Amino acid sequence: MVHVENEEQPIKLVIIGMENAGKTTILDVLTGKIMETPSKPPSMNPTKGVERSTILFFQKETQVWDLGGQETYRNEYLSNPDKYFHTISFFYYVVDIQDYYRLVSSVMYFRGIFNLIKKYSPDAKVVFLFHKTDPNYTPDERNLKGKFLEKIEPDLKLANTQYIMYDTTIFDIRSVKIAFGLES
């Protein structure tokens, strides 16, 4: 379970991942824009750059940064890390568990971001959301979650970083809330 220490500094939580991974939809659950389980995926516009919101996270006001996942923005974050990665308390990396063709790109992006976060926010807690584990989704021989973890675990071990992971879906809003400590 995600845990918040008794911190004096404000909490900064970043949600990062490839485009179309579901980051903004997750944030809409956290901010109350989506309160009931939808019957189909909501239609969303891509996040342009960084969108900031404030949520109550473990009874503490928390700044949430939703970093748009389009390639242009990903390159911007990697090129200007001092602008984005200071004072991060929680680093949520969202993986679209159904997007086989983007797995390698997602691994590479995670590695780049992870190295910068370790440099600029070495105490940030790492949380993986394996998103879109929808009711009709059945893990097949591709085993994207296992393949993703197999690729990135050596990086995490080398940096002596522990992590937490959750399977989430917009079709079970509770799964998202649990990942952010809003329900148990």
Residue locations for each model-derived region?
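Canonical P-loop GTPase G-domain recognition
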Residues: N136-S184
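Switch II (G3) loop of P-loop NTPases
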Residues: Q59-L78
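Inter-motif core of Ras-like GTPase G domains
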Residues: N75-Y100, L116
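Acidic beta-to-alpha connecting loop that harbors the catalytic carboxylate
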Residues: Q98, K132-P135
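Conserved substrate/cofactor phosphate-moiety recognition/catalytic segment
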Residues: E36-V64
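Amphipathic helical hotspot of TIR/SEFIR-family domains
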Residues: Y100-Y120, V126
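Conserved G1/Walker A P-loop phosphate-binding module
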Residues: M1-P42, F58
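Conserved beta-strand/loop subsegment of P-loop NTPase cores
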Residues: S89-Y93, I117-K132, K157-D167
